[in-house]
A protein has these predicted regions:
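Sec-dependent signal peptide recognition
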Residues: 2-9
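C-terminal motif of bacterial Sec signal peptides marking the signal peptidase cleavage site
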Residues: 14-17
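Enrichment for repetitive, rod-forming helical segments
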Residues: 10-12, 48
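Cross-family detector of peptidyl-prolyl cis-trans isomerase
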Residues: 19-302
Length: 302
C-alpha cells in the first residue's frame, strides 16, 4: 500500500486539447497521417529500446518514495537495466480523422491502481509530467489537477482508461487529501494522437513531436459535459469508444456537448423525466413515447 498527500489545485495546462491535431490555426501543410504514424512508431520504439524507468524503486519502495516514474537512458551504470520495450504494453488505436490509419500506442503500468477505472469521457484527477522524447519537460503538475478526458490529447484519453484510480482516500483536517493505491504509469504518444502539426503556440512542443507522459491517476468521476443528465458514456451512440463523431441532429455539436441532442426545441434534460418529473438515471428506461425504439431525447418527432 502506498499513499500520497496533496492539496488540490486546478490549472490550465498544455495537455488540454485546445491545440490538438484537428484544428486549423497552424498554416504548415500537414504530413500524410498514415506515413507519419509509421515514422512515429519507429521513433517511439527506438526510444523504448534505449531507455528504462526506476522499476526497482517500485519493486522495493524506499522510505518516503513518491511513486513518481523517472525515465533515463541505458548508458553507463544503467546499461544493464531492463529496457522499457520489454516492460510496456500496447493497444491499437484508430486515428480520429482518418479511420484507415492506426497507431500502436505504448504505455507502461508501474501500478494498476485498485479503485474505479475511468471511461473515455470521464473526469479524472491526476499528477503528471509531459516530456518530449529528449526527456525535456514541457508541462507538469506536482499537485492534483482535473482532466476532462474529452478535452485532452487523444492518446492521453486512450491510455488513462487502462488504469484505475486510488482505492481509497482520506480528507485531512488541514485541507489536504491522502490517496492510497492509485494508478501510476507512463504513455508514449505518437504525434497523430497528440498535437500533430498544430502544437499549442505557447508550448515548446515541435511539430510532429512524439510525447511522453508520466502520471498518477488519483480520482475519476463520471462525465456529463453538457449537463443534460445523460452521462457522456451513454452519448456514444455508435459504441466506438469515441465521443466526437456522435451527432444525432447533425448540428456540428456532438451529443456529449449538446444540451438538445435531437434539436426538437425541448432540452434533453426535460426528455429523460418520469411521469412525476423525476430524472431517470437508467438509460434503458428513458421515455420513448411513440415506441419506435428511439428514446425521445434522440427523436426529433417525439
Amino acid at each position: 500500500m502506498f499513499k500520497a498527500k496533496f492539496i488540490f489545485v486546478f490549472l490550465f495546462i498544455t495537455i488540454w486539447a485546445c491545440g490538438s491535431d484537428d484544428e486549423d490555426s497552424n498554416i504548415t501543410p500537414p504530413r500524410d497521417r498514415g506515413e507519419e504514424s509509421i515514422a512515429a512508431q519507429l521513433e517511439i520504439e527506438d526510444f523504448l529500446a534505449t531507455h528504462f524507468y526506476n522499476y526497482e524503486d517500485f519493486q522495493n519502495p524506499p522510505a518516503g518514495f513518491d511513486f513518481n516514474i523517472v525515465i533515463d537512458s541505458l548508458v553507463g551504470d544503467n546499461v544493464d537495466k531492463i529496457a522499457l520495450i520489454d516492460q510496456v504494453e500496447s493497444k491499437m488505436v484508430v486515428d480520429r480523422l482518418e479511420d484507415d490509419v492506426n497507431y500502436k500506442l505504448y504505455y507502461l503500468k508501474a501500478v494498476q491502481g485498485s479503485g474505479d477505472s475511468p471511461e473515455f469521457p470521464d473526469i479524472t484527477v491526476v499528477k503528471y509530467v509531459g516530456m518530449k522524447l529528449d526527456l525535456e519537460p514541457f508541462d507538469a503538475s506536482s499537485q492534483p489537477v482535473a482532466f476532462d478526458l474529452t478535452g485532452v490529447v487523444n492518446g492521453f484519453q486512450d491510455v488513462a482508461i487502462e488504469f484505475n484510480a486510488a482505492g481509497s482516500f482520506i480528507k485531512n483536517p488541514d485541507g489536504t487529501t491522502t490517496f492510497e493505491d492509485y494508478g501510476v504509469g507512463a504513455m508514449f504518444i505518437p504525434s497523430g494522437l497528440g498535437y500533430f502539426n498544430n502544437p499549442p503556440t505557447s508550448s515548446a512542443i515541435p511539430l510532429y513531436e512524439q510525447l511522453v507522459f508520466t502520471f498518477q491517476l488519483l480520482e475519476t468521476f463520471q462525465g456529463d459535459q453538457d449537463g443534460d443528465g445523460v452521462p457522456s458514456i451513454y452519448e456514444d451512440i455508435d459504441g466506438n469508444g469515441q465521443e466526437e463523431n456522435d451527432d444525432t441532429d447533425d448540428d456540428f455539436t456532438p451529443n456529449f456537448a449538446d444540451a438538445d441532442d435531437d434539436n426538437d426545441g425541448v432540452p434533453t434534460s426535460q426528455e429523460i423525466l418520469d411521469e412525476n418529473g423525476v430524472r431517470i438515471t437508467d438509460p434503458a428506461l428513458y421515455p420513448d413515447i411513440d415506441g419506435d425504439g428511439t428514446p425521445d431525447y434522440l427523436d426529433e418527432d417525439s
